[in-house]
Amino acid sequence: HWIQGKEQLSFLLSQSALFDTFLTLIQQKSDVNALSENGFNDGRLYHHIVRSEGFAVLYQQKQQELTARLANSALKVQADSTGFQALELFLQLLAEQDIEVTLFVNPYHYPYLDVIQQSGLQGEFERWKDLISAVAQKRQLSLYDFSIASELVMAPLQESSRDIRDNKYFWEPAHYRQTMGTLMLDAMQVGNCQVQ
């Protein structure tokens, strides 16, 4: 009886593991990040995290990461950095191909901006934006700064919520949602900066 019972138990455990694997694969398929043909990330991974753990975990993780990264006292904006040189070269190549360019500064939800301020880097952030602005002026390009303290950037955070509809514009401080992206595109394409 022991051997027969052991075989039945082994079979049941194998069936259970197979079923669990199948469920895991199905769930993963629906909640992985996916880029559309035009490069849009639909944020499906965020849906899963918010439903299971709430927005708080995303915000806490980003805040810890930012605080650690911005603690480096050597962080200084350099006009002659390789980053600015690469931007200039890239813009030159686009100009040679007659490709129209619009520059923008990403929106950051207020907790991100708070970490910049608390790290004593607000001046460096403003200097970086000034240098980007100088590049835009030099090349006669449009520049939109979505990081300013607007109604959207300062929108209250529903940290404890597990309902993805509660934070309409951001998944976490550095990643904005499609709603925000659509408003940004409207602003850049047709000059419509109105919040609907």
Question: Which residue stretches match the model-derived regions?
Answer:
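Well-ordered, non-membrane alpha-helical segments in soluble/globular domains
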Residues: 80-88, 121-132
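Active-site segments of SGNH/GDSL-like serine hydrolases
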Residues: 94-119, 145, 151
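Short amphipathic alpha-helical segments, especially helix-boundary/capping motifs
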Residues: 63-67, 106-109, 157-162
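Second-shell loop/turn segments in exported
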Residues: 73-80, 116-121, 170-171
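C-terminal regions of proteins
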Residues: 123, 129-196
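Secreted/periplasmic serine-hydrolase-like ester/acetyl group-modifying domain
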Residues: 1-97, 193
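Long, contiguous hydrophobic alpha-helical segments, chiefly transmembrane helices and signal peptides
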Residues: 103-108, 112, 128, 170, ...
